[in-house]
């Protein structure tokens, strides 16, 4: 498998993840039996993963990645408060989104580009 194909698959799966995140943020979900405020952990992890796996060809700096991922989280939280989706705006969810985006962006940059290239090379060899 060529490196361009691997990168294209990465972008495709990342875009599918973001689309699922958007839909999941706007569609009402009833979760019973979960501890109170446990959704903050889910928000944090969802946005950390989105920022961490941000396609490197679109990445300019950890700050721009944080602003875009965190901005999407804020926009979706605002949308929950404005749109008639049965969801409501929660500032703590917005904070968890932003913190997760920041941690994911910084973690992605801490993990060097060469490490990412080595991962793609190993994936390409296996394919």
Enumerate the language-model features and the residues they cover.
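Bulky hydrophobic segments
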Residues: 1-94, 98, 102-127
């Amino acid at each position: 498998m060529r490196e361009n194909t691997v990168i294209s698959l990465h972008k495709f799966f990342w875009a599918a993840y973001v689309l699922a995140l958007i839909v999941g943020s706007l569609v009402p979900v009833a979760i019973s039996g979960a501890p109170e405020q446990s959704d903050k952990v889910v928000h944090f992890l969802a946005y950390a993963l989105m920022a961490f796996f941000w396609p490197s060809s679109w990445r300019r700096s950890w700050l721009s990645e944080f602003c875009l991922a965190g901005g999407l989280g804020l926009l979706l939280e605002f949308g929950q408060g404005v749109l008639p989706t049965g969801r409501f705006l929660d500032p703590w969810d917005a904070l968890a989104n932003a913190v997760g985006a920041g941690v994911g962006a910084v973690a992605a940059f801490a993990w060097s580009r060469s490490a990412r290239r080595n991962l793609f090379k190993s994936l390409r060899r296996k394919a």
